[in-house]
Amino acid sequence: MKHPLLRPWLTEKSTGLTEKKGQYVFVVKPDADKTDIRNAVEKKFGVTVKSVRTVNCLGKAKRQQTRKGLIAGKKSDWKKAVITLADGQSIDYYSGSAQKGEG
């Protein structure tokens, strides 16, 4: 698969995971599997991936009131991956590079 990583998922919860456990969260393509995600992270950031966990998230149901009545729809389903790196390694989301800790 070509480029399964779409973007980092930056929330309070994901930032806490990064600070406490060294885990990083990415939004990935829905048809990406764990080996594709692992290979993409290792290639893009030059780090060693310890584990990959994925979650399929269902899109929210949306409704909109118009003159003709209620229009029902749904946002697209999406997938996120929680990636654990080897000890002493980190990823800088903003520069797109990896950093290795001392020790």
Curated annotation (Swiss-Prot):
Gene Ontology terms describing biological process: translation
UniProt keyword list: Ribonucleoprotein, Ribosomal protein, RNA-binding, rRNA-binding
Pfam families the UniProt entry points to: Ribosomal_L23
Annotated GO CC locations: ribonucleoprotein complex; ribosome
The name this protein goes by in its record: Large ribosomal subunit protein uL23
Oligomeric form and interacting partners: Part of the 50S ribosomal subunit. Contacts protein L29, and trigger factor when it is bound to the ribosome.
GO molecular function, one term: structural constituent of ribosome
Family: Belongs to the universal ribosomal protein uL23 family.
UniProt function note: One of the early assembly proteins it binds 23S rRNA. One of the proteins that surrounds the polypeptide exit tunnel on the outside of the ribosome. Forms the main docking site for trigger factor binding to the ribosome.
PANTHER family reported in the protein's UniProt record: 60S RIBOSOMAL PROTEIN L23A
SUPFAM superfamilies reported in the protein's UniProt record: Ribosomal proteins S24e, L23 and L15e
Domain of life: Bacteria
Listed NCBIfam families: PRK05738.1-3, PRK05738.2-4
InterPro entries per the UniProt record, alphabetical: Nucleotide-bd_a/b_plait_sf, Ribosomal_uL23-like, Ribosomal_uL23/eL15/eS24_sf
